[in-house]
Amino acid sequence: MRPAALRGALLGCLCLALLCLGGADKRLRDNHEWKKLIMVQHWPETVCEKIQNDCRDPPDYWTIHGLWPDKSEGCNRSWPFNLEEIKDLLPEMRAYWPDVIHSFPNRSRFWKHEWEKHGTCAAQVDALNSQKKYFGRSLELYRELDLNSVLLKLGIKPSINYYQVADFKDALARVYGVIPKIQCLPPSQDEEVQTIGQIELCLTKQDQQLQNCTEPGEQPSPKQEVWLANGAAESRGLRVCEDGPVFYPPPKKTKH
């Protein structure tokens, strides 16, 4: 092959390779694009009910499940969780972001899971671009939203009597001014009604201001993720609550 032809062939191969890399890079970016954050809090008593595991004496207040970018996860697998970076936050983390379903000593595994799956994607935002910022901002939002106090002030507290799903929806919308998303555990064969399990409040990407979780025409995700580890088996998954009665279970064990 003549030198000119060889150079042309090499240039063509190089251009093709660059096009392929560019396409792959765009697909990667598209896979990790997200538009809003979701502050997810769960009711520990229900979490323990849906997971067949060694859940013991769960907290009797709503705790953090996570701060999730929508439609994006696992954005940077080369950015490992480092407990040292959040050591100043540990007292609050243990109280308000506990791993309620496992009794193993290394409870930081739950935080590791949340960072690697969700935090590495949230880091696209300057206010969340480190582990300390991500977990610290999550704790700030937990305090600011104050879901536990809001429900109590509205007269919604754990009870053996059933509520209506609309009681939760209307009360939260009235206080926060936005449409939340509420997930329930479907009834088992020996249960009459669904059980409330998780409440999502959605936030704008850049400044973390409240916004509707669903807009007209938008379909909510039917099933929510569950934190599993050490071979734990999920018995039932959370679903968006159906309109109708709902059980808000009181803690089974009285704490002293």
UniProtKB/Swiss-Prot annotation:
Enzyme class: lyase
Effect of residue 65 to Y: Abolishes the effect on degradation of mitochondrion-associated cytosolic rRNAs
Gene coding for it: RNASET2
Main location: secreted
Source lineage: Eukaryota, Metazoa, Chordata, Craniata, Vertebrata
Protein name from the UniProt record: Ribonuclease T2
Localisation: Secreted; Lysosome lumen; Endoplasmic reticulum lumen; Mitochondrion intermembrane space
SUPFAM superfamilies in the record: Ribonuclease Rh-like
GO molecular function: ribonuclease T2 activity; RNA binding; RNA endonuclease activity; RNA nuclease activity
Disease implicated: Leukoencephalopathy, cystic, without megalencephaly: An infantile-onset syndrome of cerebral leukoencephalopathy. Affected newborns develop microcephaly and neurologic abnormalities including psychomotor impairment, seizures and sensorineural hearing impairment. The brain shows multifocal white matter lesions, anterior temporal lobe subcortical cysts, pericystic abnormal myelination, ventriculomegaly and intracranial calcifications.
Tissue specificity field: Ubiquitous. Higher expression levels observed in the temporal lobe and fetal brain.
Sorted UniProt keywords: Disease variant, Disulfide bond, Endonuclease, Endoplasmic reticulum, Glycoprotein, Hydrolase, Immunity, Innate immunity, Lyase, Lysosome, Mitochondrion, Nuclease, Secreted, Signal
Organism the protein comes from: Homo sapiens
Family: Belongs to the RNase T2 family.
Pfam families in UniProt: Ribonuclease_T2 (PF00445)
Signal peptide: 1-24
Record entry for activity regulation: Inhibited by Zn(2+) and Cu(2+).
Catalytic reaction(s) noted: a ribonucleotidyl-ribonucleotide-RNA + H2O = a 3'-end 3'-phospho-ribonucleotide-RNA + a 5'-end dephospho-ribonucleoside-RNA + H(+); an adenylyl-uridine-RNA = a 3'-end 2',3'-cyclophospho-AMP-RNA + a 5'-end dephospho-uridine-RNA; a guanylyl-uridine-RNA = a 3'-end 2',3'-cyclophospho-GMP-RNA + a 5'-end dephospho-uridine-RNA
EC number: 4.6.1.19
